[in-house]
Amino acid sequence: MIKDCKIKPPFFEIGPKSYLFGDDVLDLALAADAAAEKYDVDIIFTTPVIDIRRVKEATRRIHVFAPHMDALRPGRGLAEILPESLVAAGAEGVMLNHCEKQLSMSALRASILRADEVGLATIVCADSIAEAEAVAKLSPNIIVAEPTELIGTGKASDEDYVRASIDAVKNCNPDILVLQGAGIKCYNDVYRNIYAGAEATGSSSGIVALPTREARNAMVDEMIRAVRDAWDARQKG
């Protein structure tokens, strides 16, 4: 866990994965940047590695994260992702252990330590409450509590899971932020998660699988508005 992580609740994560590439990635990043400014919500934009510098230089308000890295040090390691190269490109953090890029616990520990060493914030995925508790002991900055079976389905976690996973992480380390992901596809999904107690939520296919740039950008605005609306309603009690 880096101590100067600038991300504060409420926040949202957007990951293009490999649905988008080239100018479409940049266009989505610009839409996210505008929504972050409009609603005063931090957004993690988990950027394809090759686009990190381009996205970072074109935006002001979003937090640019890499989708993966390896725990190696400068030297040999063909086609691996060097932590120092992510920092040099402008990344502020890195996502680890996504279900599409899973790590063993020993590899995850090594990767978090390397990220801490070079100053990258860490957002680590956990697909169950038990795994969230185990990951919390490694002290990442953020844990994504998303059941793998719900990813990309359009079905979000229920409120009991949201609350139980938050409690599991906070009981282990109250400084870790908790993002509730998987199956987020609309305003209501976002609102429900945030209002139920989540500090953040996020979406990939719910945004990037939409067929046009206009639809994707409109969905970004809708979801970030939901974050702000739910958070403000929660604060009012």
What are these regions (language model features)?
Residues 72-73, 79, 140-165, 176, ...:
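Glycine/Thr-rich beta-alpha phosphate-binding loop at enzyme active sites
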